[in-house]
């Protein structure tokens, strides 16, 4: 009862002081803003007792209403700077701003004290996703580079000894045969693109190979379902569901069962990236890209156009490079095209953001869309113009 009275009193005072509400400083360039995270600075001279009372009331918001997003993370009391940081929804941050004890509020951001890495010998695709404008020749990324994140690669298998993977690839499961190898090369190429030392987006992420397609690059939907299910169970058993990416650079006609399997991975807390397909048709007719919560990725070209082969439609989250992409093959580097590789870029950026921003899997696709740049010039009228961007600030 005391907590209810305390919160009610705080809200009443907030409403009375709305005229003198603290300023919520503009975020400006939002590339490095941490979603729903704020730094709250208190007015000069506020007593320790008043500060403690305020933070106690803030902590009580969540206890009284589970729908309220309010989580106080850190407090600080430096010489002339007293305040705290936390995660708050829009309504709550407005209530906090209305407290006369608050001086100003600003968005929390990613600090780059660790520095950015600039890869000089990068392919056009890596350069493109780390720069807002075309023509760059380097890949710019934070050196966290997906560290601590695993990518469950549901595909043709992976040559785990490929030098570009730097020993960070392991076998997970095989639903095709008794041969733990990649007889096609598709999976190895994707592993290199997602996490390779030279060709990769998230250069410190781990790859887990789940084989559901044979040496011809084909397999049953039942294999695909088994592969996704294995990823979900493995992540749960190892406590890494929110640090797991599932890459689905495969698919075909609509399947409710395949979509449900992909949706289960999303509900388990994972970020799932899926290729929309390369039949130049509406992607809502394909699975698993049409599954709810899955990040459906279309393919773009070097000149920021939608690839002519790429599927399209309202389910597309973003475009990503998918034409003339170089990565590791079975016999050295090869160049390939397809929406499979667009999805691989998104999986890499997903792993990168999970490591860098410490966000949850269900936030990754939204964050990818927030960072993306609207530059695709010829996308169909019912399809986004957004192009994948890692938020490097370049």
UniProtKB/Swiss-Prot annotation:
Q: What is its main location?
A: secreted
Q: Which residues form the propeptide?
A: 22-114
Top enzyme class: hydrolase
Ordered alphabetically, the record's keywords are: Glycoprotein, Hydrolase, Protease, Secreted, Serine protease, Signal, Virulence, Zymogen
Q: Which InterPro entries does this entry report, sorted A to Z? A: PCSK9_ProteinaseK-like, Peptidase_S8/S53_dom, Peptidase_S8/S53_dom_sf, Peptidase_S8_Asp-AS, Peptidase_S8_subtilisin-like, Peptidase_S8_subtilisin-rel, S8pro/Inhibitor_I9, S8pro/Inhibitor_I9_sf
> Where would I find the Peptidase S8 domain in this sequence?
123-394
Its Gene Ontology cellular component terms are:
extracellular region
List, from the UniProt record, the residues annotated as the active site of this protein.
155, 186, 340
Enumerate the SUPFAM superfamilies for this protein: Protease propeptides/inhibitors (SSF54897), Subtilisin-like (SSF52743)
Domain Inhibitor I9: residue ranges? 37-110
The GO biological-process annotations, alphabetized, read as: proteolysis
Q: Which GO terms describe its molecular function?
A: serine-type endopeptidase activity
Listed EC numbers: 3.4.21.-
Q: Which Pfam families match?
A: Inhibitor_I9, Peptidase_S8
Presence of the UniProt keyword Hydrolase in the record: yes
According to the UniProt entry, where is the signal peptide? 1-21
Q: What does this protein do?
A: Secreted subtilisin-like serine protease with keratinolytic activity that contributes to pathogenicity.
Annotated family: Belongs to the peptidase S8 family.
- Entry protein name: Subtilisin-like protease CPC735_005570
Protein source organism: Coccidioides posadasii (strain C735) (Valley fever fungus)
């Amino acid at each position: 009862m005391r907590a209810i009275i305390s919160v009610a009193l705080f809200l009443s005072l907030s409403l009375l002081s709305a005229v003198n509400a603290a300023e919520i400083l503009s975020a400006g360039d939002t590339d490095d803003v941490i979603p729903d995270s704020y730094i709250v600075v208190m007015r000069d001279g506020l007593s320790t007792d008043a500060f403690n009372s305020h933070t106690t009331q803030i902590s009580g918001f969540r206890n009284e209403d589970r729908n309220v997003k309010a989580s106080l993370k850190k407090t600080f009391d430096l010489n002339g700077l007293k305040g705290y940081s936390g995660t708050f929804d829009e309504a709550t941050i407005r209530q906090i701003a209305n407290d006369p004890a608050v001086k100003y509020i600003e968005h929390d951001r990613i600090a780059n004290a660790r520095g950015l890495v600039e890869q000089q010998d990068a392919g056009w695709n890596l350069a493109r996703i780390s720069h807002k404008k075309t023509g760059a020749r380097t890949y710019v990324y934070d050196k966290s580079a997906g560290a601590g994140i695993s990518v469950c690669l549901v595909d043709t298998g992976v040559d785990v000894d490929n030098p570009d993977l730097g020993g960070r690839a392991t076998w997970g499961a095989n639903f095709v045969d008794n041969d733990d190898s990649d007889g096609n090369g598709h999976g190895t190429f994707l592993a290199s693109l997602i996490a390779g030392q030279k060709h990769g987006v998230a250069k410190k992420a781990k790859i887990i190979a789940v084989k559901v397609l044979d040496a011809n690059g084909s397999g049953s939907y039942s294999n695909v379902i088994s592969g996704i299910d294995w990823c979900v169970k493995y992540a749960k058993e190892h406590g890494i569901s929110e640090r797991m990416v599932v890459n689905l650079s495969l698919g075909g006609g609509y399947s409710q069962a395949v979509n449900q399997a992909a949706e289960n991975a999303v509900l388990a807390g994972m970020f799932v990236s899926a290729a929309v397909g390369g039949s130049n048709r509406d992607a809502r007719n394909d699975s698993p890209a049409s599954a709810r919560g899955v990040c459906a990725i279309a393919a773009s070209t070097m000149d920021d156009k939608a690839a002519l082969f790429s599927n399209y439609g309202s389910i597309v989250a973003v475009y990503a490079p998918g034409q003339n992409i170089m990565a590791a093959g079975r016999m050295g580097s090869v160049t390939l095209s397809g929406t499979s590789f667009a999805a691989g870029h998104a999986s890499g950026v997903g792993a990168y953001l999970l490591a860098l921003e410490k966000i949850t899997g269900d936030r990754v696709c939204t964050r990818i869309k927030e960072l993306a740049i609207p530059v695709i010039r010829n996308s169909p009228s019912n399809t986004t113009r957004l192009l994948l961007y890692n938020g490097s600030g370049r």
